[in-house]
């Protein structure tokens, strides 16, 4: 029995007695116990109190390394008896021990107590290790799942804290009094050496208990043997490494100039579907469409939106099953669409520059993809990409015919235009020369009349301000002449023609000359009717017509209009 001071147990320093006893039982089904029994002789509580110290709190790894150990499941107990014997033991302690009154004595007692506890813990760990090794040496290889020690769950910092758990308070007292006395330094040095020995011993024990054979070594040996067999047989082997590596997603740089960057990021994780997955998704989509058609029929019959209970009753299922079917069908539809977005992008790129930007083309292509997913029947034996390709292309072309032209063309004309372009391109690649209209009509199956209508259809408008030329430094408005512009040559020709007409009209009578000039607007640029001319001249309308006819007969004479023939040739 030795006097000590333990802050963990609330007892006077000179009245605390410690008894260590360890009991090991034979390896039977009922496991034995290891007892740690400190007794306090100054407690005044009338009842027998038993406090439990868990092994995990002491952090003794030798008890946790083997799940089949006879003592790993037990707890450490200490009993504190109270009763009539307390006073007698207290008097004996007073007679045999000396009270610790000075600070130096307190420090020495604390150091001695910590050393005793550390030695006891080391002894118990050694005994437990020897007992475990003598019990069954084959337990290490029986089950690899149970060989992992809880010691690995703690970091180096936590291990150091666990090993110093029993003497935390003592270390604080010693560190405060380390400069008080030379004798205290010697005690502290002994305490630290004992703790260092305990740390080394406890760190060696987990390394021994964790010597479990890894399954990766067996896998590596099997792969090496397989590689040697392939080498011996002449088959080149591919080096895959010591362990299967997971595919790493390389973080690609975001191209902010890409108009479809957000769409690409959304669909980058989606994979291509297998035939089996397409069958499953198609079945889920068809079930969803069936339920939606049933809801539409109920709406038409009742004139209002049916409740969920009515919908479930009409479908012949309960509400929970109906909700699950709707949710499953929606997920199938979303997965089918997301997995084929890349197909839409590849088709939409072929129609760039036709009057719509790429984002709008992809949007219209997605509408065609949704339509194709709803109409797809996997039982026909075709892949979904083959079937949806035509729906996507049709949606893109229809949007181009409706939105890309200022002068809208019928959809059948747009389709014929695409057919003519494809036939012309194919014939040129085969023959190396531009095909004739007859060859194009034969390749497309169109009549010549229909082909000419397609070729004469309005072309997409172009801006007069867009850049053209090799260096993109010209505009169409700068190089295209205005067909309505009047040139100086035209002005000169008109002036000569006016003079020649005046000479011809001078050969007519006065009334005939005046009627012709009023009739064709040669006075003020406005052509007058026979009635207006008759009122101005004070004659009837019929008389004006007779005067006009007489003037035309005279003008048809070749002698008068011979020098006017040159203007007819110039106009033609």
From Swiss-Prot:
Its main location: plastid. The gene is SIGB. One of its GO terms (molecular function) is DNA binding. The keyword Chloroplast applies. This is RNA polymerase sigma factor sigB. PANTHER family: RNA POLYMERASE SIGMA FACTOR RPO, RNA POLYMERASE SIGMA FACTOR SIGB. CDD domains: Sigma70_r4. It comes from Arabidopsis thaliana. GO terms for biological process: cellular response to light stimulus; chloroplast organization; DNA-templated transcription initiation; regulation of RNA biosynthetic process; response to red light; tRNA metabolic process. The keyword GTP-binding does not apply. Coiled coil: none annotated. Required for the transition of plastids into chloroplasts by coordinating nuclear and chloroplastic genomes under light conditions. Sigma factors are initiation factors that promote the attachment of plastid-encoded RNA polymerase (PEP) to specific initiation sites and are then released. Promotes the biosynthesis of plastid-encoded tRNAs (e.g. trnE-UUC and trnV-UAC). Residues 215-249 are annotated as: Disordered. Residues 530-549 bind DNA.
